[in-house]
């Protein structure tokens, strides 16, 4: 069992033996207090396995984006623990957390977040340039060919379609070879064809490179590209699905009233 919201936390594995790229242990996130208190996450424990594509789904307000943001170190828990590999994020200073996000985590958001004055190639290498890290040219070439951007590297974002811009964002996340990539509604601003292209590239990153991806989505078709889906409702994990398909996901979501 890899996900639970029961009151008995799983024992942490010995350092170095954890097969989780990331995990939450008894994670709770509370906003407000008293009559205005909202429990966005309520004692959730979940593992995200290495080299796997996991989707997080649930109705609006279920806590899925909150869970992703807390596990990615973009927000803090009210109680519980979050680990990236064997590293407990609660034990890190702000500077250490910033460095961990830079060096070990890739992000893909609904908004492309590209720098408009930079070319596609410059946007892809920007995180490494800011970190003072040398670009691995062989890996860069592999990523570019995987996301099919070779003939668009000199183009600026305004010269690219939405799908091409999101492929640049995916390439940027892959280029630094992070331990895990978090994607928050990555196809939310794309048409169906562009969405399919981006999701296919993400799937290839898992299958061919062993990349770990955790994706928040409302879309059953997008979730169907994952190896596993974790379903949230009211801050709890309420179900899981292995080897999903779009039709199976849609049927399951209907049961949740969405």
Predicted regions and their residues:
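Pre-NBD coupling/linker segments of ABC/ABC-like ATPases
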Residues: 2-17
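ABC family nucleotide-binding domain
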Residues: 19-226, 232-234
């Amino acid at each position: 069992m890899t996900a639970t919201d029961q009151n008995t936390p799983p024992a942490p594995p010995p350092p170095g033996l954890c097969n989780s790229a990331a995990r939450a242990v008894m994670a709770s996130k509370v906003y407000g207090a008293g009559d205005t208190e909202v429990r966005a996450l309520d004692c959730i424990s979940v593992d995200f396995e290495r080299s796997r594509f996991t989707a997080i789904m649930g109705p609006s307000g279920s806590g899925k984006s909150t869970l992703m943001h807390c596990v990615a170190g973009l927000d803090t828990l009210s109680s519980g623990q979050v680990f990236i590999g064997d590293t407990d994020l609660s034990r890190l200073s702000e500077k250490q957390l910033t460095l961990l996000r830079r060096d070990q985590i890739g992000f893909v958001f609904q908004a492309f977040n590209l720098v408009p004055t930079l070319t596609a190639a410059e946007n892809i290498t920007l995180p490494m340039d800011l970190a003072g890290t040398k670009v691995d040219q062989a890996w860069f070439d592999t990523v570019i060919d995987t996301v099919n951007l070779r003939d668009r590297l000199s183009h600026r974002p305004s010269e690219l379609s939405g799908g091409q811009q999101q492929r640049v964002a995916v390439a940027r996340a892959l280029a630094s070879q992070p331990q895990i990539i978090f994607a928050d509604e990555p196809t939310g601003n794309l048409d169906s064809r562009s969405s399919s292209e981006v999701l296919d590239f993400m799937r290839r990153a898992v299958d061919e490179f062993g990349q770990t991806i955790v994706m928040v989505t409302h879309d059953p078709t997008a979730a169907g590209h994952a190896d596993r889906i974790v379903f949230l409702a009211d801050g709890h994990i309420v179900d899981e699905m292995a080897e999903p398909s779009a039709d199976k996901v849609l049927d399951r979501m209907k049961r949740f009233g969405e």
